[in-house]
Amino acid sequence: MKFLYLFLFAVFAWTSDAIVRIPLKKFRSIRRTLSDSGLNVEQLLAGTNSLQHNQGFPSSNAPTPETLKNYMDAQYYGEIGLGTPVQMFTVVFDTGSSNLWLPSIHCSFTDIACLLHHKYNGAKSSTYVKNGTEFAIQYGSGSLSGYLSQDSCTIGDIVVEKQLFGEAIKQPGVAFIAAKFDGILGMAYPRISVDGVPPVFDMMMSQKKVEQNVFSFYLNRNPDTEPGGELLLGGTDPKYYTGDFNYVPVTRQAYWQIHMDGMSIGSQLTLCKDGCEAIVDTGTSLITGPPAEVRALQKAIGAIPLIQGEYMIDCKKVPTLPTISFNVGGKTYSLTGEQYVLKESQGGKTICLSGLMGLEIPPPAGPLWILGDVFIGQYYTVFDRESNRVGFAKST
């Protein structure tokens, strides 16, 4: 019996004390910030395909560039440090991309987005190493560009040595001006990393900085409580979920891509009838899918299209909306109307918006569904690089 107690204590210690915890704060998305300012987001993005971007540029031996999503709806960020002594930055921990980039002290004085955010200064770091390789991420509104540098990267209690990252000297359009975060820390696979830069978590694994090669996200969907969530490096925390994790294999090691068996909207509509692919993406607030299917879904729940690609729902009808169910790995993950409808303040009034949006992701990467924060907020999610799988458990 004493041995059993010791064993249980060891297991609990791994799930709670051996992991590194990064608090996440929730902020108002770029889309909502621009809308609050009276700017027409659709006009700003006209011809840009909603700031879609390519991650991973072609070379003689590189994969085809893949169009994914934007950061217009990102809502959670946390802090990291770069250099010695540490320079602090806020970043979106994004499982839908693989690069770390931050604004550079050398950005142009005409780059307003850069001027409004924290900037990395290699001259103030004793561990900085010049690299100089040019990098660029193609957004619809232009190219975010700069050059690579190397320095130590501090995340919680972990110090990743010799991390390559992008110093951004040019940020496109107005979108990043309104961003509450300084940069992006990608947590997807190396395959989609621009310039073949090893992602931060890959460096953690190779330097044996984590107990287990997994990380997990808890996203708090209650806007009145703090913290906004937590990123756990090296494990999971039982206080954030009930029951057991159900795991599904990663079908393509680029994004955190999984197979979805189907979707249903109450008894009214079935989507993804022959199965489809989805990616699990912490950098996207909404759930997105092929536009034609999402339009059918919005019609089924009685949503009214707005000019910005969003859909509005009568707040009085939210409690009676049909349940949306996602069938993944033989399990059904359901969202009620209260869970997939977003309540926003606009002009002093509360409006209800659908948490789903159409997004065209063409072949060869797409079509894809994106399970963003609307989904992850209800299902605590673990990303397992050891076994290349994703696990879901009901959030507490």
Swiss-Prot record:
Modes of activity regulation: Inhibited by pepstatin.
Keyword Disulfide bond tagged: yes
Quaternary data: Monomer.
Active site residues according to the UniProt entry: 94, 281
Family, per entry: Belongs to the peptidase A1 family.
Lineage start: Eukaryota, Metazoa, Chordata, Craniata, Vertebrata
pH dependence of activity: Optimum pH is 2.5 with hemoglobin as substrate.
GO molecular function: aspartic-type endopeptidase activity
Source superkingdom: Eukaryota
Catalytic activity: Specificity similar to, but narrower than, that of pepsin A. Does not cleave the 4-Gln-|-His-5 bond in B chain of insulin
Pfam families: A1_Propeptide (PF07966), Asp (PF00026)
GO biological process, one term: proteolysis
Signal peptide: 1-18
Temperature dependence: Optimum temperature is 37 degrees Celsius.
Residues listed as glycosylation sites in the UniProt record: 131
Keywords annotated in UniProt: Aspartyl protease, Disulfide bond, Glycoprotein, Hydrolase, Lysosome, Protease, Signal, Zymogen
Summary of the function given for this chain in its UniProt record: Acid protease active in intracellular protein breakdown.
Cellular localisation: Lysosome
Annotated EC: 3.4.23.5
EC category: hydrolase
Domain (Peptidase A1): residue spans on this chain: 76-393
GO CC annotation terms, alphabetical: lysosome
SS bond list: 107-114, 272-276, 315-352
Name of the protein in question: Cathepsin D
Propeptide span(s): 19-61
